[in-house]
UniProtKB/Swiss-Prot annotation:
This is Homoserine O-acetyltransferase. One of its GO terms (cellular component) is cytoplasm. InterPro entries: AB_hydrolase_1, AB_hydrolase_fold, HAT_MetX-like. It comes from Mycobacterium tuberculosis (strain CDC 1551 / Oshkosh). Coiled coil: none annotated. It catalyses: L-homoserine + acetyl-CoA = O-acetyl-L-homoserine + CoA. Its EC number is 2.3.1.31.
Length: 379
């Protein structure tokens, strides 16, 4: 089934989750996933011309719930609260913010915990996917909604990788892009830390080769450990030392089996993830990050970026040790539609793109200004 074969569907009510059927998807690898469903939420009204959509793309463990309180279908508050709404950077009196849950995820979209055609969870049968596959699924979902061109795509981290694949792979479908805290390809450092996280999950006996969903046991210990390691790469070194130094946790004594304060903090982060995320999705999405390379099949990174005609804003975080500024500088130097790297000062590391909402909000406004100008040129 091609994108044009999918019957037109409708956006959900504002803030509610809608499930969009996109049919079968052939992946970059050649594998096929049948009966793909993509979860979406939206804020703001779709214009009569369907040309005011801003697609918001989440990071590894995010979902479609970018703003608002917890509720049915979304157990945590919005992960980018304040970014979309009346008078917000994505001003919903003018723009229609649409957020998807990524292919391979576990908050409504098809992933390892979803049921396959035989009525059993996909589990280990779920194929490896790429960032391009994720974007193909999003493009198909929007097409099913009758949206064939969007004003802008906005994302950080894995969402930034998706935004990059949008502007490079679908330049006729997007007028501007915001690429935050991301690079053109996965680095050795990223792959090293991420494959170690995957190894922690798979070393848990309850992983059961990925087919644990109907056994009553899940690789919770492995997922906790993976999240603890990942969270260290998300935060800034100075921030962590300022908050925790080498302090004990309360009255505990590490020399007598107690914990350090930072140790307790990381354990808490691991516990929080268990309540809302599937280990199989964590593995699948992390593998997608490992294989991220915008230059694959396009003549290399430089050729792929130089050929992109879409106006973009590229932003990086000063203290980001997972995606250091040199990676965003490369994007800014090679993308013809970029007017220079925008640097966000922050002590919060990679997570600065989530925390520094005022600075990031200004980058979003700049991106939408580019979308306006590009729209005028295309008319």
């Amino acid at each position: 089934m091609t994108i044009s074969d999918v019957p037109t569907q409708t956006l959900p009510a504002e803030g509610e989750i809608g499930l969009i059927d996109v049919g079968s998807l052939q992946l970059e690898s050649g594998a096929v996933i049948d009966d793909v469903c993509i979860a979406v939420q939206r804020w703001g009204k779709l214009s009569p011309a369907r040309d005011n959509v801003v697609v918001v793309l989440h990071a590894l463990t995010g979902d479609s719930h970018i703003t608002g309180p917890a509720g049915p279908g979304h157990p945590t508050p919005g992960w980018w609260d304040g970014v979309a709404g009346p008078s917000a950077p994505i001003d919903t009196t003018r723009w229609c913010a649409v957020a998807t849950n990524v292919l391979g995820g576990c908050r409504g979209s098809t992933g390892p915990s979803s049921l396959a055609r035989d009525g059993k969870p996909w589990g280990s049968r779920f194929p490896l996917i790429s960032i391009r596959d994720q974007v193909q699924a999003d493009v198909a979902a929007l097409a099913a909604l009758g949206i064939t061109e969007v004003a802008a795509v906005v994302g950080g981290s894995m969402g930034g990788a998706r935004a990059l694949e949008w502007v490079v792979g679908y330049p006729d479908r997007v007028r501007a892009g915001l690429l935050l805290a991301v690079g053109a390809r996965a680095t050795a450092d990223q792959i090293g830390t991420q494959t170690t996280q995957i190894a922690a999950i798979k070393a848990d006996p309850d992983w059961q080769s990925g087919d644990y969903h109907e056994t009553g046991r899940a690789p919770d210990a492995g997922l906790r450990l993976a999240r603890r390691f990942a969270h260290l790469t998300y935060r800034g070194e100075i921030e962590l030392d300022t908050r925790f130094a080498n302090h004990n946790q309360g009255n505990e004594d590490p020399t007598a089996g107690g914990r350090y304060a930072v140790q307790s903090y990381l354990e808490h982060q691991g516990d929080k993830l268990l309540s809302r995320f599937d280990a199989g999705s964590y593995v699948i999405l992390t593998e997608a990050l490992n294989s991220h390379d915008v230059g694959r099949g396009r003549g290399g990174v430089s050729a792929a970026l130089r050929a992109c005609p879409v106006p973009v804003v590229v932003g990086g975080i000063t203290s980001d040790r997972l995606y250091p500024l040199r990676l965003q500088q490369e994007l800014a130097d090679l993308l013809p539609g970029c007017a220079g790297l925008r640097v966000v000062e922050s002590v919060y590391g990679h997570d600065g793109f989530l925390v520094e909402t005022e600075a990031v909000g200004e980058l979003i406004r700049q991106t939408l200004g580019l979308a306006d100008r590009e729209g005028a040129c295309r008319r």
